[in-house]
């Protein structure tokens, strides 16, 4: 919401978050949010994805710390796949599969 407000009030600055923690976020929703912001801002949105360093909060999101690396790699793979395809067929290990999903 803050980035959308910045997009409305400015015309040249790049719009990005410090980091979007994919291990505890849904990559499809992250893509949709940033794609919408990019459209509304005339192509000024930039996404920075990361693993997250504050591990104590991960169990609150149902992330098993023993699978920490797997969560990030699996969700980054999905984020990149969604960015390249309008219709998504995908099956990973940390999220429900997608079949013919329009994004």
Q: Which ranges hold each PLM region?
A:
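Short active-site-proximal "capping" loops at secondary-structure junctions
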Residues: 1, 21-22
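N-terminal beta1-alpha1-beta2 module of alpha/beta enzyme domains
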Residues: 1-14
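Internal, glycine-rich beta/alpha segment that forms the wall or movable "lid"
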Residues: 23-103
């Amino acid at each position: 919401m803050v980035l959308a407000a910045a997009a409305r009030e400015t015309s040249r600055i790049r719009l990005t978050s410090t980091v979007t923690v994919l291990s505890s976020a849904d990559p499809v929703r992250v893509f949709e949010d940033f794609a919408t912001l990019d459209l509304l801002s005339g192509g000024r949105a930039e996404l920075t994805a990361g693993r997250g360093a504050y591990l104590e909060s991960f169990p609150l999101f149902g992330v098993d710390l023993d699978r920490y690396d797997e969560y990030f790699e699996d969700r980054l793979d999905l984020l990149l796949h969604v960015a390249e395809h309008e219709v998504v067929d995908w099956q990973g290990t940390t999220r429900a599969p997608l079949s013919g999903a329009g994004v």
